[in-house]
Amino acid sequence: MSTSQSSEQTLNYQWDVCLSNMVVQSGIGLGAGIVSSVLFFRRAAWPVWGGLGFGLGKSYADSNARLRTFHAIPKQLPASSTQKKD
């Protein structure tokens, strides 16, 4: 039996995905900036900020595309512990 999800639950799920992508991708960009700064640029600060900027920009673009497309929303959201399981 399929239960329908409210639009509020769907939007909350999409925002959760976008925020987790932002944390992960900005962390990856920051890490890549730190590594490149230490190895190649004699500990300059600009590669760190550039990597962080690339990570945040990538996550913004992904979130923008995810929130604007209708078919990107999954039909069945993962069940949370507060929902009744049948």
UniProtKB/Swiss-Prot annotation:
Residues 42-86 are mitochondrial intermembrane. The keyword Transport does not apply. InterPro entries: Mic10 (IPR007512). GO terms for biological process: cristae formation. The keyword Membrane applies. It is a single-pass membrane protein. Keywords: Membrane, Mitochondrion, Mitochondrion inner membrane, Transmembrane, Transmembrane helix. The chain crosses the membrane at residues 22-41. It is found in: Mitochondrion inner membrane. Pfam families: DUF543. GO terms for cellular component: MICOS complex; mitochondrial crista junction; mitochondrion. Component of the mitochondrial contact site and cristae organizing system (MICOS) complex. Component of the MICOS complex, a large protein complex of the mitochondrial inner membrane that plays crucial roles in the maintenance of crista junctions, inner membrane architecture, and formation of contact sites to the outer membrane. Belongs to the MICOS complex subunit Mic10 family. This is MICOS complex subunit mic10. It comes from Schizosaccharomyces pombe (strain 972 / ATCC 24843). The gene is mic10.
